[in-house]
Amino acid sequence: MSAAELVTPRVVVVDDEPALTDLVRGYLEREGMAVETCADGLAGLAAVRDTAPDMVLLDVMLPGLDGFEVCRRLRDFSDAYVIMLSARTDEIDRVVGLTVGADDYLAKPFSPRELVARIRALLRRPRSGWANVPTPGDRGAIGNTAEDTDNAWTRGELSMDLRRRSVTIRGAAVELTNLEFDLLALLSREPGVVVTRQQLLDRVWGVDFVGDEHVVDVHVANLRRKIGDDATRPTHVETVRGIGYRYRTGERRRLVHGLDPNLSRSRIGH
């Protein structure tokens, strides 16, 4: 058993339905998690700030601040994984939730087993707390990397350091969520190589992620916005229509596994 598996996951549940929070608390505690529940958005923000949880389960329809605004605000100080919960099934709610920084979206009513599976899938991903994020002064040195290594590299105006979990563009620090950082790291490690949406899901979210490929597009859109990338004329992350994404290189085309990236996905082995 790894050291990570020995740590008790901390979960904050923010929902104004007592019956649901009691059910979720009981189920997660039986799974070995420490759970705190809150009935409104302000209390949820305070709990996240005070307890620094690994996971936040956040209802969309909350009294006072709605779940979208709570998620937006907590992203100012926390990189806890966030799963949005909602009785509404509109796709726009799912898109908005992912846009404001949520990692997943689960429609009510849901199976406790499915909830636990999604929590476990996110928690298995490597994480680093905000306490380990370097100060702006520390980050400035990243752009001076003499040569690429397994843990740090420079791609034109972009520099990444995996150990520091830091990104700079033209020497300026860029704040990314863990998912956004991992997406950028995976793509920029091998410029020009096409990575399919399913490969991104498998390698960033985890092979047991329950959801559809649309989540990748939403997080890539957030990433592009933060690094100043124009989707119509990208300088960093380029869309390969119908397949996935690649990090731009001087070459106009490069193949992944020897295949033309313009081939339909059905002809690429998964």
List the model feature ranges, each with a label.
Residues 40-43, 54, 66-69, 93:
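Acidic catalytic/metal-coordinating carboxylates
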Residues 32-39, 47:
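Short hydrophobic/Thr-rich beta-strand motif most characteristic of the beta2 strand and flanking loop
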Residues 102, 157, 164-236, 240-243:
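Positively charged, aromatic-enriched patches within helix-turn-helix-type DNA-binding elements
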Residues 51-57, 62:
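Active-site beta3 strand of CheY-like receiver
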